Amino acid sequence: MAEIGTMHYLVVAAMLFIIGTVGVVTRRNVVVILMSIELILNAVNLNLVAFSRLYGLHGQVFSIFVMVDAAAEAAVGLGIVIAFFRNKETVNVDEVDLLKW
């Protein structure tokens, strides 16, 4: 059986990052955009853990900080989405114009 190497992890992380980036660029629903950002952050975590396999455990420690940041970003983002929905009754990015007078 073949060993799963670092390159395999990096390829999976690159695919996750590309899928997340395409989701952020193409979607108009705020919830889907937040999920795509979480996918990008998970790709970053996978890269950090893969490189910590080669260069020590610092990548794993930093990955924990990225997860904490992602949780805080999700909480704040969902709070903003709820505020948007209460004001405009939509979560579509194109229809939300709270900064316009």
Curated annotation (Swiss-Prot):
Compartments reported by the entry: Cell inner membrane
Q: Which InterPro entries match?
A: NADH_UbQ_OxRdtase_chain4L/K, NUOK/Mnh_C1-like
What this protein catalyses is: a quinone + NADH + 5 H(+)(in) = a quinol + NAD(+) + 4 H(+)(out)
Which GO biological-process labels does this protein carry? ATP synthesis coupled electron transport
Top-level enzyme category:
translocase
Question: What is any Pfam family matched here?
Answer: Oxidored_q2
Q: What's the protein's topology in the membrane? A: Multi-pass membrane protein
Please state what the protein is called.
NADH-quinone oxidoreductase subunit K 1
Q: Which GO terms describe its molecular function?
A: NADH:ubiquinone reductase (non-electrogenic) activity; quinone binding
According to the record, the segments passing through the membrane are 4-24, 31-51, 64-84
| Taxonomic lineage from the root | Bacteria, Pseudomonadati, Acidobacteriota, Terriglobia, Terriglobales
Query: Under the cellular component aspect of Gene Ontology, which terms does the record hold?
Result: NADH dehydrogenase complex; plasma membrane
Any idea which UniProt keywords this protein has? Cell inner membrane, Cell membrane, Membrane, NAD, Quinone, Translocase, Transmembrane, Transmembrane helix, Transport, Ubiquinone
Q: How does it assemble?
A: NDH-1 is composed of 14 different subunits. Subunits NuoA, H, J, K, L, M, N constitute the membrane sector of the complex.
Q: What is this protein's function per UniProt?
A: NDH-1 shuttles electrons from NADH, via FMN and iron-sulfur (Fe-S) centers, to quinones in the respiratory chain. The immediate electron acceptor for the enzyme in this species is believed to be ubiquinone. Couples the redox reaction to proton translocation (for every two electrons transferred, four hydrogen ions are translocated across the cytoplasmic membrane), and thus conserves the redox energy in a proton gradient.
